[in-house]
Every structure is written in structure tokens, then in C-alpha cells.
Amino acid sequence: QQLSAKLSLDGAEALSVDGVYRGGDTENPLGLTVSIPGLPLAPANAFLPPDAVRLSGALQGKLTLAGTSAKPKIDGALHFAGTQVQVPMIGTTFGLGTEKIVIDSSRVRFTGYRIIAPNKKPLTIDGEVDFADITTDLRIAATDFQFINVAKNRGSMVYGQGYMDMEATVKGEIDDLMIRGSVDLLRGTEVNYVMQDAPPELKNRAQNMVTFVSFSDTVSQRQDR
């Protein structure tokens, strides 16, 4: 059976599917090609919770699907174009790199893929996610990455500047991930959290509730004792 479908948004083709479905072939009924000249991401915001991420930009690429619907074999490559991810919880917007994300036999491979901070420093991702058995093997690294960049305003729960160095690995099945690594907060980090609905007794004890201390600061350590 021959298949053909197209999706257009605002008069422009965003996605098309062409190929065949072989109903009598139980081993390999799918033979489809998915072309994505430019799938806008902003419409997806309508289906996301208000406090989740907000997307802009587009997804582009080309995929082939073979095998069965229960166990498809996906190959191809995708990349983001002009894409930004706004995180309302921390009021900060990150850019997504334009590097190709290769999909090989249903394995999504990241090679130096970048998430770009407001200060233009990248967090890089290497490794793969295997959708056949939903397992991950990722390495994440960042240097001087600005993870918060928010001016103080009446609506902000979090404001300030935050910078970090990070090295981490993410491995295992998606429902049993093992995450290991280190995160170093850098000089210049000053982040404030506003407790908007805290009970009065908690507000009265809020000062110095959390204190970050440098272990190389021997004066502070002696005072703590």
C-alpha cells in the first residue's frame, strides 16, 4: 500500500511522509521516508504545562523508517534551526546548537552537541540514546556555563547570576538512570530564591538558611566550629 502525507503550517510545508506499508510482510512492513524541511516548534507550547519549557525555532532533517510499528528501525539525521528553550522556573533562555543529531538503527548519537548559555558558553553532550531498549550512555561537560541570568523583578521566584563548571555521565535504562559527576559553582554566582508562599515561622528563620562555604576558606570553617 502506497502512503503519502504532508503537513503544512502557515502555507509552508513543514513535514512530509512517503513510502509503502506492506501489510502481508510481518518482518518488515514499513518502508517510509519522513522529510522535515522546517517543523516549527512554537505550536508545541500549547500542549506543554505553563511552567514547563517554552520552545521557539524549528526542527529540520530526514528520516527513514523500516521494520515494524512495534519495533521500528529509524535512520537519518535531525538538527535544530534558530531554536531557543525558555525555562520559566529560572527565567533563563538557552539556545540549541545546529549540530546534526544522527540516528543510526534507532540509536540517537550526540557528537559535541551544544546547549548554549546566555553568556554564549556551551554545555556539550556526547554519547547515545538507544530507543530500541530505551537506554542512555551520555557524557556532559561545561565550563563557565551561565545557568541563571535573571534581573530582579516582582514576578521572579529566582533571580541573579549563576555560573558553573560541570562534568557528568548519564547511563542506564531510562527508569533507572545512574548519574555521576561534579558541579562547581564559580566566582560571580549570586542567586536569590523568593519564598512567596512560605508560612510566617519559616520566613522568620529564612536568613542564612542555606550558606555556601568554600572549603579553602579556613577562617569561615573555624567560625562554624
Q: Whereabouts are the PLM-identified features?
A:
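Interface amphipathic segments
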Residues: 1-62, 70-75, 79-167, 173-225
